[in-house]
């Protein structure tokens, strides 16, 4: 296995130096967290499934012209991505009331919202990722108005496409979180979709039964977490057959 220099480790992924300038290797872990890291656990095989699911969805988005950092999947747990300057915001898209929105506004969970709602959260673990407004974002220089316009346009297109895709396999896209980055190509910069799209950062409910098929099963101690992730992959037609060697992490060069 190739020896790579580790650059960053987050809750669910590790970033390594890529084989070429301007590239990184993104490794998907089985670690699971909730409550901004207050609850921790392991979901066996989660990294393998999320790698495949995110690859599939990123490629489908690329097909309709949405720029992403994804280049290609390397193996069961790793993918090659473009190195981008991450914008320190989480863009949350809500189609159905659930989670913090339902609690904060007293809306019964499962209520279809009058229209899609976009929220912004400042990425800062020590502050518990506070919700912020466009005024905060531009005032503190996290993103300019033009960047935000691009992010919103890409977010709405992504939501429209993914909502339809999931409807086609009997799943409701309740809400999800996106992250964006600035991709520099010489003097030119464009906003691209980054991070991942998986049951880790999407709320996915069975369209008929409203059974949760996402990380809420871990957050709420509902059990059958692995099975839920497998169900999503199976419906997408990409359920992988992992071997023991696929479950090992990469060899790290200190």
UniProtKB/Swiss-Prot annotation:
First-level EC class: ligase
Keywords on record:
ATP-binding, Ligase, Nucleotide-binding, Purine biosynthesis
GO terms under biological process: 'de novo' IMP biosynthetic process; cobalamin biosynthetic process
Indicate whether Transferase appears among the record's keywords.
no
- SUPFAM superfamilies linked: SAICAR synthase-like (SSF56104)
Q: Which Gene3D superfamilies match?
A: ATP-grasp fold, B domain, Phosphorylase Kinase, domain 1
Q: Name one GO molecular function term.
A: phosphoribosylaminoimidazolesuccinocarboxamide synthase activity
| E.C. number | 6.3.2.6
Please give an example of a GO cellular component term from this record: cytosol
- Which pathway does this chain act in? Purine metabolism; IMP biosynthesis via de novo pathway; 5-amino-1-(5-phospho-D-ribosyl)imidazole-4-carboxamide from 5-amino-1-(5-phospho-D-ribosyl)imidazole-4-carboxylate: step 1/2
Name the chemical reaction catalysed here.
5-amino-1-(5-phospho-D-ribosyl)imidazole-4-carboxylate + L-aspartate + ATP = (2S)-2-[5-amino-1-(5-phospho-beta-D-ribosyl)imidazole-4-carboxamido]succinate + ADP + phosphate + 2 H(+)
NCBIfam families per UniProt: purC
Q: What is this protein called?
A: Phosphoribosylaminoimidazole-succinocarboxamide synthase
Q: Which organism is it from?
A: Gluconacetobacter diazotrophicus (strain ATCC 49037 / DSM 5601 / CCUG 37298 / CIP 103539 / LMG 7603 / PAl5)
